[in-house]
């Protein structure tokens, strides 16, 4: 663990994510091992009507390239795709995992199902497509279709800022709190 990184280092990482671009070689991906939230298969079935969805995980497996060509490097694998289906395992306030950020980092557009009130407005909600469980998602599906057919529209959508600058301070603050708490715990143990 590098304790010497700076706020500027965090900013560089966020800038790299915001500037990531899909190669647009393939339509959509879904990398998941299960469908416990009972939404991944639903999204797969709907999106598959628009284009071919490659599934490199255990769920709906139809693609071995993540393992065979990309040595299980998910980000490099996702770079080939325009879209990534990435619902969270559960939808609850403040719950967000790597799924959304992996899509951003690879430059593909996330088709996301999760907390719509992403904490502190750290993420540009216009840079992803929200698929809502149990709701009418026809507009989301139409948008996927439009973006898939129109490269200029896709590029404009993809060029949006994905992670807001407020994330730098948020992550720096979290880092400081964790390090301070670790120091407290260590000092308590040494007494």
Task: Place the predicted regions along the sequence by residue.
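Pol beta-like nucleotidyltransferase catalytic core
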Residues: 1-55, 59-87, 93-191
């Amino acid at each position: 663990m590098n304790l010497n990184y700076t706020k500027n280092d965090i900013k560089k990482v966020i800038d790299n994510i915001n500037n990531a671009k899909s190669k647009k070689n393939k339509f959509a991906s879904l990398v998941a091992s299960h469908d416990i939230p009972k939404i991944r298969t639903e999204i797969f079935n709907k999106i598959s009507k628009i284009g071919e969805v490659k599934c490199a995980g255990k769920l709906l497996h139809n693609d071995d390239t993540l393992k065979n060509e990309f040595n299980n490097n998910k980000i490099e694998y996702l770079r080939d795709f325009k879209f990534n289906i990435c619902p969270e395992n559960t939808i609850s306030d403040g719950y967000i995992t790597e799924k959304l950020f992996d899509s951003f980092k690879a430059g593909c557009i996330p088709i996301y199902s999760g907390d719509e009130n992403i904490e502190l407005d750290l993420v540009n909600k216009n840079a992803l497509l929200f698929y809502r469980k149990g709701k009418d998602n026809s507009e989301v599906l139409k948008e996927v279709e439009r973006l898939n057919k129109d490269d200029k529209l896709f590029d404009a959508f993809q060029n949006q800022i994905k992670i807001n600058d407020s994330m730098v301070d948020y992550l720096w603050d979290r880092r400081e709190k964790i390090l301070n708490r670790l120091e407290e715990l260590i000092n308590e143990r040494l007494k």
